[in-house]
């Protein structure tokens, strides 16, 4: 089954992975009708943080398809291998130009979407991608309930991120909310009816850089308040002329307060590489529960 779902892409550089994790190829199943999520997570984690394409039908059930080359951001929940379309909640897109329309597959120039190539690095504990349009390097990792982002911006333009609470995979929010809590914290939620009749996803976002400007949008119309509750909430956070921004996004299905507690219990520091190493250790321990003895490297990659 794994061979049938695989897309035959070349192996990436897994030199940083050790143990059985070095044999994992996250691209297997991301083409054809595989419906496999591509991104980063920990075993059985609530967060599956990874790239999201514009939804174009059944082959995009996970929010991503290997044939695609247009990215609308990084969302924190993805289905994998289900054949059903849903999730892709709490979409984050790093920007150095303020844009709030999404854009479309045929012409992205009027929106925030960006082209990308597959010359990136992906392992279960780490995902990295260069946004061609903005020349921004994105790096992602995760704990159980927290997505950890590290963005490196080119010089000369203010560093920003877009939060799109309307956008989902095949289903848009019917209610959403965002609030600036302080100069480093934003919270909100997204209510959606999709394949699941009703889902509620709450989040708290913290940045390591001061939010110099917070703008909430009703779809693409800016609003003058530090909080907003409408069906199509978007927000742009601007950090000024900084080289690097780290953000942590904690999730809860209960409340924003619970999301804040999840963040406090799982990730109080800002050491991105430490979280990558922690995730790698957890994956290796999980993979070590079953081993295969063979000298065939390709068979190991298919198995793991």
Predicted regions, residues:
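Accessory carbohydrate-recognition regions in carbohydrate-active enzymes
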Residues: 12-304
């Amino acid at each position: 089954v794994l061979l049938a779902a695989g897309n035959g892409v070349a192996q990436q550089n897994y030199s940083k992975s050790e143990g059985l994790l070095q044999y994992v190829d996250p691209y297997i199943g991301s083409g054809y009708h595989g419906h496999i999520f591509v991104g980063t997570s920990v075993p059985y984690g609530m967060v599956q943080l990874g790239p999201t394409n514009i939804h174009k039908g059944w082959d995009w059930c996970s929010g991503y398809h290997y044939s695609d080359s247009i990215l609308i951001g990084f969302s924190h929940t993805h289905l994998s291998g289900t054949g059903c379309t849903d999730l892709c909640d709490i979409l984050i897109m790093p920007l150095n130009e303020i844009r709030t329309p999404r854009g479309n597959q045929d012409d992205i120039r009027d929106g925030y979407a960006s082209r990308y190539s597959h010359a990136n690095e992906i392992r279960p504990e780490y995902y990295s991608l260069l946004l061609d349009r903005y020349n921004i390097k994105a790096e992602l990792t995760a704990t159980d309930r927290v997505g950890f982002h590290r963005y490196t911006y080119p010089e000369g333009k203010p560093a920003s991120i877009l939060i799109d609470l309307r956008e989902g995979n095949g289903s848009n929010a019917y209610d959403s909310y965002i609030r600036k809590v302080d100069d480093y914290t934003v919270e909100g939620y997204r209510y959606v009816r999709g394949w699941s009749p009703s889902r509620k996803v709450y989040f708290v976002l913290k940045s390591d850089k001061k939010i110099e400007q917070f703008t909430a949008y009703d779809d693409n119309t800016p609003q003058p308040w530090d909080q907003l509750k409408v069906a199509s909430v978007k927000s742009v956070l601007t950090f000024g002329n900084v080289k690097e921004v780290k953000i942590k996004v904690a999730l809860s299905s209960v409340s924003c307060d619970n999301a804040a507690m999840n963040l406090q219990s799982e990730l109080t520091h800002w050491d991105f590489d430490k979280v990558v190493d922690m995730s790698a250790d957890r994956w290796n321990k999980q993979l070590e529960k079953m081993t295969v003895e063979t000298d065939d490297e390709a068979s190991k990659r298919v198995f793991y």
